[in-house]
Amino acid sequence: MSSVKRNPKKEMISELHSSAAEGNVAKLAGILSHSPSLLNETSENGWTALMYAARNGHPDVVQFLLEKGCDRSLVNKARQTALDIAAFWGYRHIANLLANAKGGKKPWFLTNEVDECENYFSRTLLDRRSDKRNNSDWLQAKESHPTTVYLLFSDLNPLVTLGGNKESSQQPEVRLCQLNYPDVKGYLAQPEKITLVFLGVELEMRKGSPAQAGGVPEEEEDGLVAWFALGIEPGAAEEFKQRHENCYFLHPPMPALLQLKEKEAGVVAQARSVLAWHSRYKFCPTCGSATKIEEGGYKRVCVRETCPSLQGVHNTSYPRVDPVVIMQVIHPDGTKCLLGRQKRFPPGMFTCLAGFIEPGETIEDAVRREVEEESGVKVGHVQYVSCQPWPMPSSLMIGCLAVAVSTEIKVDKNEIEDARWFTREQVVDVLTKGKQQAFFVPPSRAIAHQLIKHWVGMNPNL
C-alpha cells in the first residue's frame, strides 16, 4: 500500500479554521503564535478563519482575529465577505463588529500615496489678498481705478459672452465679461441695490498699465489689478443685456458653469459662493436685526449695537462653506465600484455617492454613514484623494476612496433611486465611449468623474 503524503501546512490551516468555527480562542491563539502567517489563509472554498467565526456566531473569535490584523475585505468563491456571511445568518452583533472595526490591513489594491491634483473650480487667476479687505481706502481707490475688473452677476449667474474657439466637447467656449469702472459706475452709485465683493488681484502683473492715462497719480499706483464681483437686481440685469446684446447671464448653473475656462471657473466659484451667502444672511442670525457688509464683502456685521455677535469672533459673521463627502466605493475584491443615481438625474446617469458631513463627525465616519444610509453597503477603509469647490452654492466636495466590507445593496428610496455594482470593464467603456453605453457618468470637470477615473487607473492589471 502506498502511504498518503502529509501536508503539514494544509493540516495547520484546517485546524485553524476548525478552531474558529468551534469558537476556541485559546487554540487559535496557540496556532497563530506559532504560525502568524496563517491568519488570512483560505480553504478550498475560499473561506478564512474570520469567515468561519462569522458563520458560526462567535463574536469573541471575530474580535480576536480583528485584533490580530486579519483582512476582513477578503471574499470567498461565492463572492462573500465575512460581513456578508454574518449578516446572512442573522448575527447582527458580529456584523456590526466587522463593519465598524478600525484600522486593519490596508486593501492590496489601494496605492500608498495619491498624487495631488487640481480639480475644476479649484484653479484661479487671482491672489485673494485678504490683507486688503480691511483697507477701506485702498478698496475705494481700486473701485474707480481704470484697470479694475468687474464681474457682473444676476441671481448668482455670471455675465458671459461666447468666445471664438470651440472646445473638444463641441461646446462653444464661454468667457466671462470683464467690465471696467465706466461700465458699472451707475450701479456703484446705488450701494443699497448691489452687492460688491473684492475677489483679489491678478497673479501676474500687467505690463504697460494704463493707470496714468486714466488720471491715477504715479505715487498712488501699486501695479495691482483688482477684481470685484458685482451682484445686481434682475431689473438692472435685463436693462444691461438690452444694451449689450453679445452678453448674457449664464443659466442654469449646472451644467452651464462647466463651460467656463478653468481659471475663470475658479474665480466664479469664489464669487458665486460669497454672493450666495450674502443673499441668505441679510439679517443677523443671532438677533434678527439688519446687517451691513464689511471687509470687502467677506463679513456681515449686525447694526444692533448690543448684539452678542459683536463680541468676539463668530462664524455667523463670515461666509460659510458646507463640507460634503463624495466617495468612490470599491468592492472588497477591487474589481467593481458602487455607483448610484437620484431621481432628478438625466436618464441613465450614475455617479459616486455623496452627502453632507454632520457636526462632530470625521470625514471617514461621514463616508461610512452616508454609504450605508443610501445603499445599505458597509464600508471599512477610507482614503482621501482630492477635493473640489462646488459653488451650488458653497460646498466643498471632499473626494475619497472607500472600500466596502459588505456587498449586498439595500437602497433607501428616500435617499437615492438606484445603486449598482459596475465592473471595471463597464466603467472603462463608459469613460471611453460615453453615452453610447447603457449608462453614463458625470463629465470630466466633476470630481465624481475624476474619482472614477482614479479607481480605473490604479487597477491596470485587472
Swiss-Prot record:
Known EC number: 3.6.1.-, 3.6.1.22
Entry's localization field: Cytoplasm; Peroxisome; Cytoplasmic granule
Catalysed reaction, written as an equation: a 5'-end NAD(+)-phospho-ribonucleoside in mRNA + H2O = a 5'-end phospho-adenosine-phospho-ribonucleoside in mRNA + beta-nicotinamide D-ribonucleotide + 2 H(+); NAD(+) + H2O = beta-nicotinamide D-ribonucleotide + AMP + 2 H(+); NADH + H2O = reduced beta-nicotinamide D-ribonucleotide + AMP + 2 H(+); NADPH + H2O = reduced beta-nicotinamide D-ribonucleotide + adenosine 2',5'-bisphosphate + 2 H(+)
List of residues binding Zn(2+): 284, 287, 302, 307
Cofactor names: Mg(2+); Zn(2+)
Expression (tissue specificity): Expressed abundantly in the liver and kidney.
Disulfide bond residue pairs: none
Cofactor note text: Binds 3 Mg(2+) ions per subunit. Binds 1 zinc ion per subunit.
Positions annotated to bind Mg(2+) 2: 370
Family matches, as SUPFAM superfamilies: Ankyrin repeat, Nudix
Chain ranges for the short sequence motif Nudix box as given in the UniProt record: 355-376
Occurrences of domain Nudix hydrolase (ranges): 319-453
Keyword terms: ANK repeat, Cytoplasm, Hydrolase, Magnesium, Metal-binding, NAD, NADP, Peroxisome, Repeat, Zinc
GO biological process: circadian regulation of gene expression; mRNA catabolic process; mRNA methylguanosine-cap decapping; NAD catabolic process; NAD-cap decapping; NADP catabolic process
UniProt xrefs under CDD domains: NUDIX_NADH_pyrophosphatase_Nudt13 (cd03429)
ANK repeat residues: 11-40, 45-74, 78-98
Family that this chain belongs to: Belongs to the Nudix hydrolase family. NudC subfamily.
Protein name as it appears in the record: NAD-capped RNA hydrolase NUDT12
Organism encoding this protein: Mus musculus
Organism taxonomic ancestry: Eukaryota, Metazoa, Chordata, Craniata, Vertebrata
